[in-house]
Amino acid sequence: MAPYRPEFSAAEQSRIDAEFSRLARNKSVYLDHAGTTLYAENQVTAAAEQLQRNVICNPHTCRLTGDFVDQVRFKILEFFNTTAEDYHVIFTANATAALSLVAENFDFGSTGDFHFCQENHTSVLGMRERVRANGIYMLKEKEISGGELKKNGTVHKVSGKTGNSLLTFSAQCNFSGYKIPLDTIEKIQIDGLSKPGKQLWGSLGENKENTHNDYYICLDAASFVATSPLDLKKYRPDYVCLSFYKIFGYPTGVGALLVSRRGADVFQKRRFFGGGTINYAYPHAMDYQLRETFHQRYEDGTLPFLAIVGLLEGFRTLERLVPKTDEFSTMERISRHVFGLAKYLEDQLRQLQHPNGEPLVELYNKVGYQDKSRQGGIVAFNVRTESGSFVGFGEIACVAALHGILLRTGCFCNIGACQYYLNLDEDAMDTIYKRAGRICGDYFDLVDGQPTGAVRVSFGYMTTFQDVEQLLQMLRSSYLATKPLQRIQFIEEQAEQLPPLLKERVQLLRPKLLQMAIYPVKSCAAFKIELEGSWPLTDQGLRYDREWMIVDMNGMALTQKRCTELCLIRPVIKVDQLELQFGDNSHFSVPLSLEDQAADSAKCVSKVCRQPVEGLDCGDGVAQWLSENLGLEGLRLLRQSGQRNSSKDQQKLSLVNQAQFLLLNKSSVRSLQFEEPLDETVDRFRANIIIDTGSAFEELTYKALSIGGIQFQVEGPCQRCDMICINQRTGERSPETLTTISRLQKGRMRFGIYITRIPQDTKELEAKEHMTCGDVVLVE
């Protein structure tokens, strides 16, 4: 690993630090420059002084204001190494408004299509709603940048073509910092697209050929130009969209759309026009004439002239604090600086490991950090626990905030990049956004243990090496040297210091009761309670859990060791009946009421774990139904009628083998990494109480816990046998379940923990005779 080499001299760094002294005063580390960079202190002071010196008013009134605006247009063109001969500058509110302007005014002709890259800002997805294209297509990044550029090609408009197609992509992905090679622009302008992409709208089944259309490029440069030079002499997109606060930090509310001469030829003013865009418009007739000057036709209404004038100090500040050298321009030096920091951080993150050798972070990038022309100053990642489970990005945001570190979490208004880097298929997207209810900007960070977003840190010219070190130290101290419960306690104790949205996230840090599983008939399938459902408790455990069992002709309890088909009997608890189902059409019901059952039943005795159990025979009808479906003669269904106590501590038990409840941590199940669906693996362990702590095997350290205020003591781990090798949905055996647990537990067959409800001496908790899915789990 190469050592970090600073781009700026000590004197330059000192001048920069002096301009951002407020960070030190506030004990803040700012690492969200892809969201917005920071303004220098003298920058805003100089901008204010300029307003105080001059009378800057509406440009329609004051020529001085118009001169200032023209200066800024010239400076923008110079900044991108081009001139007014090649590009027009249209001021907009931001990059989003620039993209909207392109969508509204681009002339697709009769056959033109709209194409966009999957890894794009949400605003590009919004363009789909406004374009008047023949078809709309999504392209993966490789489909855009994967081809070879023809040599000596010429961009031109070929006669006979009937439409204009538009491709929009980001010069730099704001999620990962990946940069699409800019020579892709000319390639597509010359050759078109080899593949149109996935069709989202339009006439299906059409054979799209490049010969029908000319191709134009709209470059979303907002993330790219904040820290990288864009040379419009070398690369000539037809449209460039940007926001100036990304570059300067101040002012906000002003962006630009740069339109090439080629792009202007297919730009047509649509429907609306505002003040300043026309030569005249009659109120008494549908007659108007637009301005001759191109940019004036599209700058509806009064420009944000004070903000535009403030841009001059932004340019001056960059040139003052990061002066060009004989070798590199200002923006090239900034690019080198942020890339160097990102490369150092990525190198350090790769070295962070848990004591068992598992990596602390999972990084999201395409080409690594070897070439700044392909990767910018952004690092995206998620944190993993020692067992490999993901830590929710909302928790990372809380911990970072309490350490004074400002970073970004989520999908960063780039759901397509989230989909790509997190490997989310269409069903997973529906699970996250439609079924689980996540919305953009929330802290709903894990669904079934899988992340719905990531952590992003991004750098600007004022970011220091020490800032990166503080982030690394926070990760080391919080996630390598601290146990999860200690970390949660730390966050909860400091929660009042957090902003409102993160305070809400603190409430989600504690694990919750996800599901309860009642097994009315011993060794048969579960009846499940989930989605905020409640279930009553008795002094033996969950009501109706293991109250029935099937015995053979010798009176011995039948288990899945002898008959795996037992798992195919599905009990359903109804208002007054227990319905047993086998397959789609076969079912039989017995009374839920013990009194009703006792009236028509004979008493009998069986054994569970060598202990005698008093029971009631449920009759010949259900006995015959069981024998027919399971293919065994002489089966009977018994219901427990007498009290059964544990031989160990006299706790009251149903027909369970060892304890009142078996608790399972879904994170532990997830660590097995079986190919079958996670819920199928959970079913193998036949637990009553399912939680998800985010940290595998954490439950093995518990001594006591409470669920929704109900106290439990831990009896110990559940020692597993080959019963867990049976798939509870098919009855098929697969031995890898047991061997995997043995490997993870170093030869021990422990999975899940037995817990027992702690008796209460008073009746003050009578209201707590139910547990509800969603109850908070507190560990002692």
UniProtKB/Swiss-Prot annotation:
Segments crossing the lipid bilayer: none
Disulphide bonds in the chain: none
Active site feature: 413
EC number assigned by the record: 2.8.1.9
Signal peptide positions (record): none
Catalyzed reactions: Mo-molybdopterin + L-cysteine + AH2 = thio-Mo-molybdopterin + L-alanine + A + H2O
The MOSC domain, residue ranges: 635-780
Source organism superkingdom: Eukaryota
Cofactors named for this entry: pyridoxal 5'-phosphate
One function term, GO molecular function aspect: lyase activity
Record keywords, A-Z: Molybdenum cofactor biosynthesis, Phosphoprotein, Pyridoxal phosphate, Transferase
One Pfam family hit: MOSC
Keyword Translocase: no
UniProt similarity note: Belongs to the class-V pyridoxal-phosphate-dependent aminotransferase family. MOCOS subfamily.
Function: Sulfurates the molybdenum cofactor. Sulfation of molybdenum is essential for xanthine dehydrogenase (XDH) and aldehyde oxidase (ADO) enzymes in which molybdenum cofactor is liganded by 1 oxygen and 1 sulfur atom in active form.
Name of the protein in its database record: Molybdenum cofactor sulfurase
Organism whose genome encodes this protein: Drosophila yakuba
